[in-house]
């Protein structure tokens, strides 16, 4: 079999006659059952799902990575996502620091390789099916392909669109792109693109990319109407409505830059209507507290709840996908033994956000409070959660009392807040306390706020062959409720929007009220609640770039592991946008002089040294 690189290179577009032979490219991780499919076209459709479980490209230096892992890699460039453990194992550190060079760092090259690899897959199938003469099965498959292509281009154009910085301290040191990149998206490659065209394929305008996205969505809606998916990996009409809502929210947020899509009021009304249709058509309901915190199925099982509208999955037989360093369960697992690139890195919630989140909100239990690490086996009822205090009653750090052997901790004492809630752990309290230590690189111990949101499959934290085979949500119904509230703000006003925001957040905190009286106040509450809701699911990256939320991890008392992570930028953060990798620049001369530029963030770090930053661990936060 041939090896291909990316959609921009001439070698990507295989001839029509060779499509069947190339249905299972050697660069993809494939499930043996899917590979043995009796129908070649159906096998190609099935390979969409397995490709999203694990894509690789050895020639391009792309390790096996899943769709979910790509999205969380991007999210490392947002305020809520903090890493508190050993930086040497942080394979996503470039995104965390905002150091994605213009020619594509080792991590910056992933989006273009990955998404164009996905696009090539669906293009091959679309090119095989004649919409004027197709069976019901072919019609369904064509609809699935158009839905996925819309998803891929929608995410890729958001990632690659260059946005000019708005923060004065960033503008002052900006390395200007070689040419004006305003409203430039990505090269468009479809089933009709020839090899010659692919080798000289300029960046289409963002508007042109959205033309294709909306066209694909219209076809997907037409072809999938009446189709009932047998599995959540197949998009339903409800998922198409959800994609419409996402797309129109982005169009509405960029009317000042767009050349064609200028009707902001109509787009917001579309967001409201499509989000509402998605909620109704899906029949889905928000996750309950028990489902969210389920130590066996929490955020790893597409069938254990009624919230997910669209999903990816990794089967246990897909050994490359479950053993990769970019397996989602490995990356996000605090309790798992699978990889030091996960539990020793310590994906955590930003401290300021954690402290702002109400104790009455059960989502807060997704991150471990510092007091969790001070609960010894000698804990007395009613006494503070401290191993040792000094004469003044303060925590005593002098004897390194937290670096205890596993046996010194109690498995059964595990309490959060005055209600003495027990965290729902997949492993045990002693297991976590024995590993999440200063000795293992957690220099800010115990001020980590480390996550237990994402559970290994079946709750199996010590066997990657089982625990790493997890599902991942492409779309949850909760997102539609949030988008509906955002759209209501721009179409009906603050009161209507506040009511809708209250409706969804009250399912997490029954005492929540939205007291906003202005659009600005509403959006502040909206963004906070949505960031908490979708932490670790990739949604926060796309929202941050769409709404230009900046990155605000630089402050006194931050829980960042090192000062390079403690960025404080308003508006557009340049670290959201990677450059095109060198192979693509060489293969496609039309984009060579239109690459995204790179500005080193060291010129606007909040802190200038680790000593300066770490001296403030655990100190009271200063609230503006």
What annotation goes with each model-predicted range?
Residues 19-72, 275, 333, 342-345, ...:
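Membrane-proximal, proline-rich intrinsically disordered regions
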Residues 2-42, 213, 245, 485:
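Bacterial Sec-dependent N-terminal signal peptides
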Residues 157-164, 228, 250-261, 492:
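Short coil/turn linking the two alpha-helices of tandem helical-hairpin repeats
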Residues 20, 238, 243-291, 308-309, ...:
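Aromatic-residue-lined binding/catalytic grooves and analogous aromatic/hydrophobic interfacial grooves
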Residues 86-163, 200, 204-209, 218-230, ...:
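Conserved, well-structured interaction surfaces
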């Amino acid at each position: 079999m041939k090896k291909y690189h990316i959609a921009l290179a001439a070698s990507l577009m295989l001839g029509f006659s060779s499509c069947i032979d190339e249905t299972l490219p050697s660069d993809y991780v494939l499930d043996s059952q899917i590979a043995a499919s009796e129908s070649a076209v159906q096998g190609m459709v099935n390979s969409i799902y397995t490709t999203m479980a694990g894509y690789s490209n050895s020639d391009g230096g792309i390790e096996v990575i899943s769709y979910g892992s790509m999205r969380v890699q991007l999210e490392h460039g947002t305020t809520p996502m903090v890493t508190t453990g050993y930086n040497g194992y942080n394979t996503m550190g470039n995104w965390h620091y905002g150091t994605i060079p213009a020619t594509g760092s080792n991590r910056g090259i992933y989006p273009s390789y990955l998404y164009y690899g996905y696009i090539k897959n669906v293009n091959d199938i679309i090119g095989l099916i004649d919409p004027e003469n197709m069976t019901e099965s072919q019609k369904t498959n064509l609809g699935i392909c158009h839905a996925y292509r819309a998803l891929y281009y929608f995410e890729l154009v958001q990632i690659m669109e260059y946005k000019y910085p708005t923060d004065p301290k960033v503008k002052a040191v900006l390395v200007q792109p070689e040419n004006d990149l305003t409203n430039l998206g990505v090269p468009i490659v479809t089933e009709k693109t020839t090899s010659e065209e692919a080798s000289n394929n300029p960046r289409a305008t963002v508007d042109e990319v959205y033309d294709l996205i909306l066209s694909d969505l219209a076809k997907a809606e037409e072809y999938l109407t009446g189709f009932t998916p047998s599995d959540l990996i197949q998009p339903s009409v409800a998922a198409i409505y959800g994609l419409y809502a996402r797309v129109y929210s982005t169009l509405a947020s960029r009317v000042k830059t767009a050349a064609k899509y200028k009707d902001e009021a109509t787009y917001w009304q579309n967001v409201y209507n499509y989000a509402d249709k998605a909620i109704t058509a899906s029949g889905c309901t928000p996750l309950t507290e028990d489902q969210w915190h389920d130590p066996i199925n929490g955020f790893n099982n597409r069938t254990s709840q009624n919230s997910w509208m669209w999903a990816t999955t990794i089967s246990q037989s897909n050994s490359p996908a479950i053993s990769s360093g970019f397996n989602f369960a490995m990356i996000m697992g605090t309790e798992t033994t699978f990889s030091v690139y996960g539990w020793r890195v310590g994906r955590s919630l930003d401290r300021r956000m954690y402290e702002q989140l109400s104790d009455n909100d059960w989502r807060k239990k997704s991150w471990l409070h510092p007091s969790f690490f001070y609960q010894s086996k000698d804990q007395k009822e009613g006494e503070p959660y401290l191993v040792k205090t000094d004469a003044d009653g303060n925590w005593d750090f002098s004897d390194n009392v937290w670096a205890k052997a596993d046996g010194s901790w109690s498995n059964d004492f595990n309490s959060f807040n005055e209600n003495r809630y027990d965290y729902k752990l997949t492993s045990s309290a002693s297991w976590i306390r024995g590993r999440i230590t200063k000795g293992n690189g957690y220099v800010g111990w115990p001020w980590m706020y480390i996550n237990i949101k994402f559970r290994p499959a079946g709750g199996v934290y010590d066997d990657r062959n089982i625990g790493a085979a997890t599902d991942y949500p492409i779309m949850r119904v909760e997102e539609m409720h949030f988008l509906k509230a955002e759209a209501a703000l721009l179409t009906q006003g603050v009161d209507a929007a506040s009511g809708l925001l209250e409706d969804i957040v009250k399912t997490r905190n029954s005492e929540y009220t939205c007291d906003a009286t202005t659009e600005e106040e509403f959006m502040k509450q909206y963004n906070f609640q949505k960031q908490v809701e979708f932490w670790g699911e990739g949604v926060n990256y796309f929202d941050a770039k769409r709404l230009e939320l900046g990155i605000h991890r630089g402050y006194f008392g931050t829980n960042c592991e090192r000062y390079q992570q403690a960025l404080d930028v308003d508006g557009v953060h340049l670290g959201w946008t990677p450059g095109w990798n060198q192979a693509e620049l060489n293969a496609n001369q039309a984009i060579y002089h239109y690459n995204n530029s790179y500005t080193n963030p060291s010129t606007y770090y909040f802190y200038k040294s680790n000593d300066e930053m770490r001296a403030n661990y655990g100190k009271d936060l200063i609230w503006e």
